[in-house]
Amino acid sequence: MTERLAIVGLGGSLARTSRSLAALRVALDGAAEAGATTTLLDLRELDLHMYNPDHEGEPPPAATRLMEACYGANGMLWSSPMYQGTISGAFKNALDWLHALGSREPPFLHDQVIGLISAAGGSQGLQAINTMEFAVRALRGWAVPYVVPVASAYRVFDSEGRLTDESVELQLRTLGAEVVRVATRFADDSTAQRARACEESAELVAAAG
């Protein structure tokens, strides 16, 4: 490919200092180092209204910005704190707004490659990752198998949200690069066609079952 891929990072929290946002920034750096152009959608800065299906026709400006950035991307990186065993309400609200993309062709985040990150106070960050994987499938995307659940996040970020653990930094940069690598393959028409064939086969199997 000659054009640089566009990777959008979505996440963070509503807190002034967000560990999940700091993790997302590092992963986006990894994507940029792999040759992609990157855009950050910080949930605190976006300040989205609560999703309302009645407003899909005329969404608020922040929701429009979110939807257009996500729909135009080749791939994404998602990052959420883990609250009560799952993703944050703010992150889920952002995903709810993406429901409005269902009327487009192709719909939702069709064939987009998505890398997943969570930041947890304990060791159960995979629970938030699992929730995100369900959402990726619902939005017709493809989650890369490599995920980064940052456990005991308070230990690997300082009080200003700066990452202090080299091992976690490497994992996050690797995830960013992996999203670019897989998205590059999907950008090849023949690869995308094979991916769609796999998706159609999976739908047929599900219908038969």
What are these regions (language model features)?
Residues G35-M50, A143-A151:
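Short beta-strand elements in bilobed, periplasmic/extracellular small-molecule ligand-binding domains
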Residues L43-P60, V156-E160:
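N-terminal beta-loop-helix "entrance" segment that forms/cooperates
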Residues T2-A36:
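N-terminal beta1-alpha1 ligand-phosphate binding loop
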Residues T2-E3, V8, W142-G209:
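Glycine-rich phosphate/pyrophosphate-binding loop and the adjoining helix
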Residues E58-L139:
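Helix-loop-strand module that forms the ligand-binding subsite of alpha/beta enzymes
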Residues G12, L43, A119-G121:
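Cofactor-binding loop segments of dinucleotide-utilizing enzymes, especially the Rossmann-like FAD-
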Residues D29-A36, A100-S103, R137, G141, ...:
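Generic secondary-structure signature for well-ordered alpha-helical cores
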